[in-house]
Amino acid sequence: MPERALAEQGQLLPDDVFASLEMTRVGLKGPTTTPIGGGHQSINVVLRKKLGLYVNFRPVITLPGLKTRFDDLALDIAIFRENTEDLYAGLEHEVVPGVVESLKIITENASLRIARAAFQFARRESRKKVTAIHKANIMKLSDGLFLKCCRQTAAQFPEIAYNELIVDNACMQLVMRPQIFDVLVLPNLYGDIVSDLAAGLVGGLGIVPGANMGDHHAIFEAVHGTAPDIAGKGLANPTALMQSAALMLAHIGERDAAKRLKSAVASVYAEGKHLTGDVGGRAGTAEFTDAVVRHIGG
């Protein structure tokens, strides 16, 4: 745990962790806690900055057999969130007592990188449309620059449709007509909020995988937070971590293994007999996992 490493070694992430990541260039990460209103920095932010993980990728896909508000729509939305700047740059200070200022950083380089990643994915996966989400009607310079970069990139992919939505309208459309979305590209803060909203459409954060990727490294993770109240009780839903492992396998070229793991998870949900409590079942972590393993072996 990062808290233990900080207490024992004075580092959130010990040097040997980074040495391993530098060697393998790939990692599978579990949830970690970030203190609210003080304490140590987010582990995710540290990793993203140190390893140049500028893409946060989250596929939001309906699982057969899982009851949700939109389980009849077979949603498949790919979300690309810029991972290194915006308000998450952490540049804030107290101007005078009672007045705090936070700086929103948007750069051409980072905006072009995330836009290119979204469009390259759309082309590679035969997707039809990329939607840029923004608040350029208010933040005309910062979000305006982000849109300029998205438009510039869209022009290089003429076979892919491109449109733009203001973030508040995009949130409304997601809960009313989620089926209209295909690939989304967003600055950091909006991406954090919208990707959690989208996860709720298909069953919540216990279901959805995530990846943080750069030019040389990639870390895959369950995007939900920690749950200290159920730690050690065998109640946690491992779906998001399994789905993230499948993303990792595909990333390193083990596409057949990735497909088998995803298919096994989907089969367990389709059967509905071994689901954890957060999705309406009565199984524990081990029972769910055993069911997935049986389907992989079968």
Predicted stretch roles:
Residues A7-K104, L189:
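N-terminal glycine-rich phosphate/adenylate-binding segment common to multiple enzyme folds
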Residues G284-G298:
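Phosphate-binding loop/pocket of nucleotide- and phosphate-handling active sites
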Residues V96-D168, I180-D182:
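Glycine-rich phosphate/diphosphate-binding loop of Rossmann-like nucleotide-binding domains
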Residues L63-L91, I106-A110, G225-K259:
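Short, glycine-/small-residue-rich phosphate/pyrophosphate-handling segment
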Residues E125-H134, F157-L165, E254-K262, E271-R282:
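Flexible, glycine/charged-enriched surface loops at secondary-structure junctions
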Residues M1-R4, L165-M172:
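Short acidic loop-to-helix transition motifs that present clustered carboxylates
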